[in-house]
Amino acid sequence: MKMFAYRGKHENFGDELNHWLWERLLPGFFDEDESQLFLGIGSILYDNFDPNMQKIVFGSGYGGYTNPPKVDGNWTFYFVRGKKTAEVLGIDPSYAIGDSGILTRSCWDAKSIEKRYPVSFMPHYESAMYGSWDKVCELAGIHYIDPRWPVEKVLTEISASHKVVSEAMHGCIISDALRVPWRAIRPIAPGNRAKWYDWASALDLEIDFDPIGPSNVVEAGASLVRNNTYLLKNITFRHRRIRQLTGNYVFGSTVKTLQRVAEKPGQLSSDESMVNAHNRMLLELDRLKQDFSKKTASVL
């Protein structure tokens, strides 16, 4: 069985978490046999997988990046990210347990890490690339967490924070799993909000999104031409040059907005919802191991 995980040109905490988490929970479980594909963390339930390949779904979500996949006998579901995913796929809502990143609770002791930061901010990885959020955080007096850092460094910085403000969905998901209060920054593109609501639905959680402006001229320009692919590519391709020409100028209004958001109380799903979701995932993890140990034994 091969593990499938999205990997772009730049590392991204939510996607890299797959490689970190599953090698700890399922050591020696995966190989390069693509006849069976393991789908874990992420909005990776696409419609373009080989229809003859067996897809094993373990906490993934539907993100709307393709049409919904046609579910047939080659799809096996242990659980999915949320109620919307279950609805779109036409499977029983009882499969909606939560994002499998919650299983980080089984591999990481956040309580053993000393709290050092009153508030930390984690942008979306594209915002980290094109924006100047490290400078915004410096001016706002808020600790900066880069989603492109190695997984364990991000986990350490989240654990060392009293509160996390995050534009990155897995910044909030993992903060919630580790019981670190968080606030969510509203995604600029409305289409990116559905996956947040999907995750929250499994935990009976209402997300109180905060809007925030662009950090610099690159992000402001990209926001204005978001629907024009040609112009958007031109701006993002030249982002370093634009920042150089503008002296890496950041918008003071965004600094103030981030400070205001940081002063608000953090959110958390209920302890009961989190413990229940985690325990159900552990049961499914045991079932997965049993199911495939039996199949391996039958082949031998």
UniProtKB/Swiss-Prot annotation:
Catalytic activity, as annotated: [4)-beta-D-GlcA-(1->4)-2-O-Ac-beta-D-GlcA-(1->4)-beta-D-Glc-(1->4)-[3-O-(CH3CH(OH)CH2C(O))-(R)-4,6-CH3(COO(-))C-beta-D-Gal-(1->3)-beta-D-Glc-(1->4)-beta-D-Glc-(1->4)-beta-D-Glc-(1->6)]-2-O-Ac-alpha-DGlc-(1->](n) + n phosphoenolpyruvate = [4)-beta-D-GlcA-(1->4)-2-O-Ac-beta-D-GlcA-(1->4)-beta-D-Glc-(1->4)-[3-O-(CH3CH(OH)CH2C(O))-(R)-4,6-CH3(COO(-))C-beta-D-Gal-(1->3)-(S)-4,6-CH3(COO(-))C-beta-D-Glc-(1->4)-beta-D-Glc-(1->4)-beta-D-Glc-(1->6)]-2-O-Ac-alpha-DGlc-(1->](n) + n phosphate
Keyword Transferase annotated: yes
Disruption phenotype annotation: Mutants form aberrant non-nitrogen-fixing nodules on peas.
Entry EC no(s): 2.5.1.98
The keyword Transferase is annotated on this UniProt entry: yes
Molecular-function GO term, any one: transferase activity
Pathways per UniProt: Exopolysaccharide biosynthesis
Keyword vocabulary terms for this entry: Exopolysaccharide synthesis, Pyruvate, Transferase
Disulfide bonds: none
InterPro entries named among the record's database cross-references: Polysacch_pyruvyl_Trfase (IPR007345)
Coiled-coil blocks: none
GO BP, one annotated term: polysaccharide biosynthetic process
Top class in the EC scheme: transferase
Superkingdom as given in the UniProt entry: Bacteria
Family: Belongs to the polysaccharide pyruvyl transferase family.
Function according to Swiss-Prot or TrEMBL: Catalyzes the pyruvylation of subterminal glucose in the exopolysaccharide (EPS) repeating unit.
Protein name: Exopolysaccharide glucosyl ketal-pyruvate-transferase
Protein source organism: Rhizobium leguminosarum bv. viciae
